[in-house]
């Protein structure tokens, strides 16, 4: 029999950090109630005989005392606690776990590397958008998981005994950021990956996602520096060079890198460079969730959507009372426009999908107030939890919604980093036109619109007599041509 409580908790006793995630089940989806994370650096407390030091164990117990208070009102059957790499190998893990279970009041399961990889993939499949066929990479403090899969099913599961804490202690223990340190760390990581590389490459993948603190740190760095969100080997090598220039770990300064993440960033970076090199990864983006989300979704009777983004968009529409028929009407129009100019404007499937998402959410600001509805919409999208969308994609959607009507904020379109600024500008133009043409909110009042693009010049051709028969929309289009002209986007209505 299911508990009446809608609260669930997942706790991950990792080698670098302990994490707790508490959620509430709401209408078939989850709402985050609390996230607590503490750096305990458990792996750093292992001696040559794999015994945890008293200090490391005490750091862990102090953290669990914090967690235990939050767990008191959650049924034990709705709590899952797992321990990973360090507690798999610690000779005195039993002593630590006995006290941990007393503090938490529930069992702590030490899971195998393969089970950890499976749970990570489960978390990614529930929270991350993109292609059905993926490679998932998670660099933890004491282990690194590599998983391929299709949809919700993993196809290969690997857990390697290398992590950002163990590599820190092994290859950066002198606190120097020299070429030799990085070379040794990378070569050791490549030697770990090489035996499984062929198996992973044989499965293949269409997208690669990273689900670790190292990848999160890279995303924060790239957003701070105005780079696009895709992680590439070239960007990783540039960041390595910047770290080497800093000379010492204590003097590591990279724009966007927080002090909290700095200590294990070089070791995590060296492992990631090795993974990119051995597996020939072209690019990677940040996953929406991993181990903790995998634990939670394992307890919740929720289906894995084939497209997590579709579920998210549907949930947001329902929550903010969006007219789904009008949203779909605008989406279909915008998609038609995008397909007509896709070759000239270099709009790929990814760009068109993000444009469609903006269309489906463009009216959420009306739930706050008609006045400044675009600003309200942008604010909501910026701060809502949108599973399936990366932080950079959320920023792009917010930017498009803020620019959906009226004055155009060009700097805002340049500040997002999900797409090239020129592509974002072109999506904005198409969204604005689709909203105008769909303003009657009826399918039988949509004209046959033909678009032609020549660089930034956009010509909109309408059936003969249409403008005369529709004076309001003719006026809106005339004003739109002026708005776009102010930012040097030539728009011709014919």
From Swiss-Prot:
Pathway: Purine metabolism; ppGpp biosynthesis; ppGpp from GTP: step 2/2
Biological process annotations from GO: guanosine pentaphosphate catabolic process; guanosine tetraphosphate biosynthetic process; nucleobase-containing small molecule interconversion
Substrates-to-products reaction catalysed: guanosine 3'-diphosphate 5'-triphosphate + H2O = guanosine 3',5'-bis(diphosphate) + phosphate + H(+)
Enzyme class, broadest EC rank: hydrolase
Gene3D superfamilies: 3.30.420.40, Exopolyphosphatase. Domain 2 (3.30.420.150), Hypothetical protein af1432 (1.10.3210.10)
Keywords in alphabetical order: Hydrolase
NADP keyword on record: no
One annotated GO molecular function: guanosine-5'-triphosphate,3'-diphosphate diphosphatase activity
4Fe-4S keyword on record: no
Highest taxon in the source lineage: Bacteria
Stored SUPFAM superfamilies: Actin-like ATPase domain, HD-domain/PDEase-like
HAMAP family linked to this entry: GppA
Family in the record: Belongs to the GppA/Ppx family. GppA subfamily.
Functional summary from the UniProt entry: Catalyzes the conversion of pppGpp to ppGpp. Guanosine pentaphosphate (pppGpp) is a cytoplasmic signaling molecule which together with ppGpp controls the 'stringent response', an adaptive process that allows bacteria to respond to amino acid starvation, resulting in the coordinated regulation of numerous cellular activities.
Protein name: Guanosine-5'-triphosphate,3'-diphosphate pyrophosphatase
Source organism per UniProt: Erwinia tasmaniensis (strain DSM 17950 / CFBP 7177 / CIP 109463 / NCPPB 4357 / Et1/99)
